[in-house]
């Protein structure tokens, strides 16, 4: 269920402050964050965020198609290593 429109989008205050500071200065440094729950707003465009996935920070460059999604959607938390290979030689023994 989506968030109510009367509440507005959720963005952590410290993250919004960092983006606003960089927008006024005109810099595009990487912003390290643990806030996977923050919604991507149009003023995030062109910035790179280092989003924490539980182990490391994954770089996420924000494009226009990402607006309206959450930062955590672009930093997967689980690594899929694939299923075991079907090895016929091992089965024969």
From Swiss-Prot:
PANTHER family: RIBOSOMAL PROTEIN S19P FAMILY MEMBER, SMALL RIBOSOMAL SUBUNIT PROTEIN US19M. Gene3D superfamilies: 30s Ribosomal Protein S19, Chain A. Residues 1-25, 74-93 are annotated as: Disordered. This is Small ribosomal subunit protein uS19. Keywords: Ribonucleoprotein, Ribosomal protein, RNA-binding, rRNA-binding. Coiled coil: none annotated. Belongs to the universal ribosomal protein uS19 family. GO terms for biological process: ribosomal small subunit assembly; translation. Signal peptide: none annotated. One of its GO terms (cellular component) is cytoplasm. Protein S19 forms a complex with S13 that binds strongly to the 16S ribosomal RNA. Residues 14-23, 81-93 have a biased composition (Basic and acidic residues). It comes from the Bacteria. HAMAP family: Ribosomal_uS19. InterPro entries: Ribosomal_uS19, Ribosomal_uS19_bac-type, Ribosomal_uS19_CS, Ribosomal_uS19_SF. GO terms for molecular function: rRNA binding; structural constituent of ribosome. It comes from Beutenbergia cavernae (strain ATCC BAA-8 / DSM 12333 / CCUG 43141 / JCM 11478 / NBRC 16432 / NCIMB 13614 / HKI 0122). NCBIfam families: rpsS_bact.
């Amino acid at each position: 269920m989506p968030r109510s429109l009367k509440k507005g989008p959720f963005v952590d205050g410290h993250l919004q402050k960092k983006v606003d500071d960089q927008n006024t200065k005109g810099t595009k440094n990487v912003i390290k964050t643990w806030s996977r729950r923050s919604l991507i707003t149009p003023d995030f465009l062109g910035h790179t965020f280092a989003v924490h996935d539980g182990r490391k920070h994954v770089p996420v460059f924000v494009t226009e198609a990402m607006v309206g999604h959450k930062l955590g959607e672009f930093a997967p938390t689980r690594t899929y290593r694939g299923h075991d290979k079907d090895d016929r030689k091992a089965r024969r023994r």
